Each structure stands twice: as structure tokens, then as C-alpha cells.
């Protein structure tokens, strides 16, 4: 569960984007888009628990798109008549909101192991958003804006890159996911895993301290409760997701009590 600054709650991998109103002015829409692009670019230096390479490519595309939006903002000024590009820009605004939510999920402290195990789902979401950027941007009526040739070329570049960008989990992610599943299988058979294997998993997702583990456990507890409520609401008797989350909580508790205690002892 994500607790926002406004006090609202959002389940991970849900994207409650708000469609800009039809009467929005072009300048207001562009200003909001430029702000959203800036927000997205702040994730460039953050630690991604999954799909790092794909996100880096997408952020580079947003960086180029931010340049385009700034140039459009300068060129169009404050038009008195309806601008035909508002529709495609509104679509991009929704895409940016969803992308920001996805970036928040994949860099969130406490959700690192959970997001790693959702790597395929993250890839699917990012693929859809990337293709949507290409579709919406290609529909933008560049003929209505007197843009420099290099900016038009940048638009074409972003469209082509987004269209060709195949999103898939990083190979390192897949290896670590396999390791997590192997460790969970060992726990089920009451066998202790190799500490080196556990350390490799923790280093990959960025869980390094006792406090990190506490955040992971708290988040997983919230997700388990939310999942149970959702299942009850939908009369869903499937416990697969709850079982996975519970197993991950057990894994993190083991890491906190056994592995990180050993790290602390050896460093003191």
C-alpha cells in the first residue's frame, strides 16, 4: 500500500491517473506536462529493485520529450483558439501520471522484494506505457507548430525508440528471482539456505540493514491485509498471492534475524 502526501492510499501496480478536463488551456496542460516530466527525471538516480535497464531507457526518452515540450511551450505561446494538439498532449499527460506511479512502486523503500517478484507484471505495464507514448506523440500535429527541424527530428526519434523498445525483465532480475524461489523451496523443506545466496539477493534489491527489513515486513503485512480484503470483496477464494506474500515475509524475517545479525556481528 502506498501512502501519499495527500493521505490517499494506492495499491502497488495500480495507476489512478486523472484525465485533464476538456476545457484545459494549452499553456496549463503544457506546464503540467513539463512538471510531470521533471518529476519522472528525478527517478534517474534512484535504486530500482527490478527492470533497471528498461526504466533507464524510458527515462532517457522522457528527457528528450521534455525538451520537445519546452520548445512547444515557447512556440505556441497562449493561443486564443482551440489547438488540435490538446488531445494527444492530454493522452501523454495520463501516460506520464501512470509512469510516475510505476516508478514510485519500483523504487519504493519497503517494496523491493515484492516488486522484484512482480518483475514480469512491471515489464508488461512499462511496455504498454512506452508504446502509448509512441502512439500519442505520433498523433501530435507538428504542422500546427513552427518547430525547429532538430526538434521535429527529436520527436521522430522518441516515436521510433518508444515503438521499438522491447521491455523485458533484466537477466540479473531473473537469476535473483530464481534464487528467491529456490530459497523459499528450501524453507518449505526445512533446509537452511546458503548465506552467500541470501546476501546476493539482498544486495540486488538494496536491502542492507535491519531497518530496511522492518520496512519490507511492514509493507508485506499491509499488502497481505489488502489482498485478503480484496479477495473477500470479490468472493475470490484464491490464496496464491497471499501465500507468496506470506512466504516473502518469512524470508525477510529470516534475513533480519540470521543474515543481518551475522553481518552486524562481523562488522563490530
Residue ranges and their predicted role:
Residues 233, 265-268:
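Onset and early core of a folded interaction/catalytic domain in large eukaryotic regulators
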Residues 77-255:
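Alpha-helical bundle protein-protein interaction modules that mediate dimerization/oligomerization
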Residues 2-78, 136, 140-147:
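N-terminal amphipathic alpha-helical segments
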Amino acid at each position: 500500500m502506498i501512502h501519499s502526501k495527500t493521505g490517499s492510499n494506492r495499491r502497488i501496480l495500480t495507476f489512478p491517473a486523472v484525465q485533464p478536463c476538456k476545457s484545459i488551456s494549452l499553456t496549463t496542460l503544457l506546464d503540467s506536462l513539463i512538471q510531470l516530466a521533471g518529476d519522472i527525471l528525478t527517478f534517474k538516480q534512484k535504486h530500482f529493485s527490478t527492470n533497471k535497464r528498461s526504466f533507464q531507457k524510458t527515462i532517457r526518452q522522457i528527457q528528450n520529450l521534455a525538451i520537445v515540450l519546452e520548445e512547444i511551450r515557447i512556440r505556441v505561446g497562449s493561443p486564443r483558439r482551440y489547438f488540435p494538439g490538446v488531445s494527444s498532449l492530454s493522452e501523454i499527460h495520463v501516460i506520464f501520471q501512470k509512469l510516475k506511479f510505476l516508478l514510485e512502486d519500483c523504487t519504493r523503500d519497503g517494496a523491493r522484494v515484492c516488486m522484484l517478484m512482480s518483475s514480469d507484471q512491471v515489464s508488461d505495464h512499462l511496455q504498454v506505457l512506452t508504446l502509448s507514448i509512441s502512439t500519442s506523440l505520433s498523433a501530435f500535429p507538428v504542422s500546427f507548430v513552427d518547430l525547429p527541424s532538430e526538434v521535429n527530428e527529436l520527436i521522430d526519434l522518441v516515436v521510433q525508440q518508444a515503438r521499438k523498445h522491447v521491455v523485458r525483465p533484466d537477466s540479473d532480475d531473473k537469476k535473483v528471482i530464481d534464487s528467491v524461489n529456490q530459497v523459499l523451496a528450501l524453507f518449505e523443506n526445512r533446509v537452511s539456505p546458503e548465506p552467500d545466496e541470501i546476501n546476493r539477493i539482498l544486495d540486488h534489491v538494496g536491502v542492507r540493514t535491519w531497518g530496511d527489513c522492518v520496512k519490507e515486513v511492514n509493507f508485506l503485512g499491509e499488502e497481505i491485509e489488502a489482498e485478503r480484503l480484496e479477495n473477500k470483496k470479490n468472493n475470490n477464494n484464491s490464496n496464491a498471492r497471499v501465500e507468496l506474500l506470506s512466504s516473502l515475509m518469512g524470508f525477510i524475517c529470516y534475513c533480519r534475524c540470521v543474515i543481518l545479525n551475522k553481518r552486524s556481528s562481523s562488522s563490530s
